[in-house]
């Protein structure tokens, strides 16, 4: 499969600390790829670079072969229309003074998509398992799991090709995590949406992703199909992650 979103040789340093060291990753249309690793391995740094929210010291990020770097809202608008993100903490990602319908439609306004977005908002709310009249309510009226569904709806508003999710369920309880993971899988299949999921929870990865990259100290130490990597880990970091408590696997089993 040809790459839709591709990063080549990404390196990012903060002072004397190398957070990411010559990392390459590609994502094809409709593919679901996970980036896993222990705390401080460089996962979130990679996500920020792939979202053009930070500038690498070396390497490139390209969408359909077109390079992208951080810049003004106008210069990156083409990229933002096609690549969106789901936040780690949905509670902090919504303006408490903005009704949910306006919040879900906010990316469309920011990306200069003109018109009445009420029909699109209603469609998105139904797609994530909420009622259309939720648009009139306020963020604080929803549970954590419902707010994450709203965050997913907001990310889908401009009909992106790629969704980057950095620890998308870590702030949720175990049962709600499974519900949100299943929702992401369903939406990815229905929309042909490519997913890049950053997670330390291998249960999430096993249920959602096709392929996995394992990071350690800013480098890719192992990668391949999820079943192969998790079935016979070749690196000690992967083995340690697999030995950790599998939050979702425990629920499913």
State what each model feature region is:
Residues 68-84, 98, 102, 110, ...:
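ABC ATPase NBD coupling module
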Residues 223-224:
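ABC ATPase "signature
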Residues 51:
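Helix-to-loop junction immediately C-terminal to a conserved catalytic motif
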Residues 138-142, 146:
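Conserved ABC ATPase signature
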Residues 59-70:
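Conserved ABC transporter NBD signature motif
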Residues 116-133, 242-243:
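Conserved ABC ATPase "signature" region
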